[in-house]
């Protein structure tokens, strides 16, 4: 068992998150966060230093495309992922880079290849976890009276031929990294 902090964005409350995870570690609980890594490095590190595993999202390597979809560029995120992959394993932690595959946004070969090459160049060979797109959040937007930003996109299932082709491309471009598809194949050891 263990404790996972996710969001929203856990780093928006980094001081509380860091103290919570410190107490968990003191009590021998496995600790994990899920983050976009969009925060100052010192905020991220205050939290990550107490984690056994950090799941970090890599949405797009092109900063303009990233900005168009998320509202922010990716420079801080890429820098933080790079530092995290260098620093966390020194403390016995593990980084898993997750690439959510959104049809028409980042699931073309060029975008996928750029992400795979980035991950392949990171220290300590983090796992690359490919996340098939799902539209489960659409109903939440409806409940709060907001427009869903990706209307009409269908969820993809784990063994979709396109997803398998993306996984094969990533395995070819990042041969020293474990490349998993969906959440069921993640190595947390």
Language-model features: locations:
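Conserved AdoMet/S-adenosylmethionine-binding subsite of the radical SAM
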Residues: 1-136, 142-143
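Auxiliary Fe-S-binding modules of radical SAM enzymes
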Residues: 103-189
């Amino acid at each position: 068992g263990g404790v996972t902090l996710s969001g929203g964005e856990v780093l928006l409350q980094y001081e509380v998150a860091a103290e919570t995870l410190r107490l968990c570690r003191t009590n021998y609980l496995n600790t994990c966060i899920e983050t976009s890594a969009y925060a100052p490095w010192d905020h991220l590190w205050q939290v990550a230093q107490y984690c056994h595993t950090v799941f970090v999202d890599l949405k797009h390597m092109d900063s303009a495309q990233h900005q168009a979809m998320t509202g922010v560029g990716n420079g801080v995120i890429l820098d933080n992922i790079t530092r995290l992959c260098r620093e966390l394993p020194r403390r016995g932690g593990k980084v898993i880079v997750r690439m959510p595959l959104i049809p028409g946004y980042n699931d073309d070969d060029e975008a996928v290849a750029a992400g795979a090459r980035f991950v392949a160049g990171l220290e300590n060979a983090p796992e690359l976890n490919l996340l098939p797109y799902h539209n489960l959040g659409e109903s939440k937007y409806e409940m709060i009276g907001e427009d869903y930003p990706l209307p009409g996109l269908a969820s993809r299932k784990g063994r979709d031929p396109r997803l398998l082709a993306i996984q094969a491309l990533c395995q070819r471009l990042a041969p020293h990294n474990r490349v998993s598809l969906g959440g069921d194949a993640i190595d947390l050891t």
